[in-house]
């Protein structure tokens, strides 16, 4: 189980990313069609936004344990939790296959 502070930090990053998403997106679109001087100004504005508002700072975490590695996007679970839940028939449509 991940520490509670790490899970809360990730939630804070997600909230910041949602808050600044449209602003960052519009600035990035403007920078594609602008002159060099305008690009410098847009770059300065992007740099002045909070660091944690960038989408690259986000990590996917397991929804049950908070584990940051080996996550399946379709389920939002880490690999070992997915396996345990699939064996317990808690995930609809998932069958254990072995051959």
From Swiss-Prot:
The organism of origin for this protein: Pinus thunbergii (Japanese black pine)
Kindly give the Gene3D superfamilies that the UniProt entry links to this protein.
1.10.287.1480
Member of which family?
Belongs to the universal ribosomal protein uS14 family.
Q: Which Pfam families match?
A: Ribosomal_S14 (PF00253)
UniProt entry keywords in alphabetical sequence: Chloroplast, Plastid, Ribonucleoprotein, Ribosomal protein, RNA-binding, rRNA-binding
Q: Name one GO cellular component term.
A: small ribosomal subunit
Query: Any S-S bridges, and between which cysteines?
Result: none
Region called Disordered, residue ranges: 46-66
- Hydrolase in keyword set: no
* PROSITE patterns assigned to the protein according to its UniProt record, in alphabetical order: RIBOSOMAL_S14
Enumerate the subcellular locations listed in this protein's record, separating them with semicolons: Plastid, Chloroplast
Its biological purpose is as follows: Binds 16S rRNA, required for the assembly of 30S particles.
Q: How does it assemble?
A: Part of the 30S ribosomal subunit.
Q: What is this protein called?
A: Small ribosomal subunit protein uS14c
Top-level lineage group: Eukaryota
List the lineage, top down. Answer: Eukaryota, Viridiplantae, Streptophyta, Embryophyta, Tracheophyta
Query: What would be an example GO MF term here?
Result: rRNA binding
Primary localization class, coarse = plastid
């Amino acid at each position: 189980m991940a520490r509670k502070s790490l899970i809360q930090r990730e939630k804070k990053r997600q909230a910041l990313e949602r808050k600044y998403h449209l602003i960052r997106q519009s600035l990035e679109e403007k920078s594609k069609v602008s002159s060099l001087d305008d690009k410098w100004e847009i770059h300065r504005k992007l740099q002045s936004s909070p660091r944690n508002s960038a989408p690259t700072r986000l990590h996917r975490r397991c929804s049950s344990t908070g584990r940051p590695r080996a996550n399946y996007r379709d389920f939002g679970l880490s690999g070992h939790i997915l396996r345990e839940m699939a064996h317990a028939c808690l995930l609809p449509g998932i069958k254990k296959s072995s051959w």
